[in-house]
Amino acid sequence: MKLSCLSLALAIILVLAIVYSPHMEVKALADAEPDAIGFADAFGEADAEPKRRRGLKKIIGKVIKGTGKVAGEAAASAVADAAVSAAIDAVVGTTEEPEQ
């Protein structure tokens, strides 16, 4: 009984391998990018990464820098407003806590 189950499992694996191997081969031939990256890595070329990924990294970097700049300006504005409010309170003589 164990031998027939093992034979059945191996037969199913063999059939699946035969059925799906042409599909995988076509898919591998259609996408040449992994081959190019593997070739560049194998020969130690510095430009192993596709140009579109480098472009995407530049765009993401610019977005992060811009977001950081806006957040920094907002924080500086909030600190400046709190300082002005504290200075006015000191001159006027109120003892209210500044809003946070």
UniProtKB/Swiss-Prot annotation:
Gene Ontology CC terms: extracellular region
Annotated signal sequence range: 1-17
Propeptide regions on this chain: 18-50
Modification after translation (UniProt): Glycosylation is critical to maintaining the aqueous solubility of this protein, but does not directly contribute to its activity.
Tissue specificity remark: Expressed by the venom gland.
Pfam families with a match to the protein in the record: Pilosulin (PF17499)
Top-level taxon of origin: Eukaryota
Subcellular localization: Secreted; Target cell membrane
InterPro entries, alphabetized: Pilosulin
Note: Very highly expressed in the venom apparatus (5%).
Function: Neurotoxin that triggers pain behavior and inflammation in mammals, and is paralytic and lethal to insects. Causes a time-dependent increase in cell leak current. May act by targeting membranes.
Protein name stated in the entry: U-myrmeciitoxin(01)-Mg7b
UniProt lineage: Eukaryota, Metazoa, Ecdysozoa, Arthropoda, Hexapoda
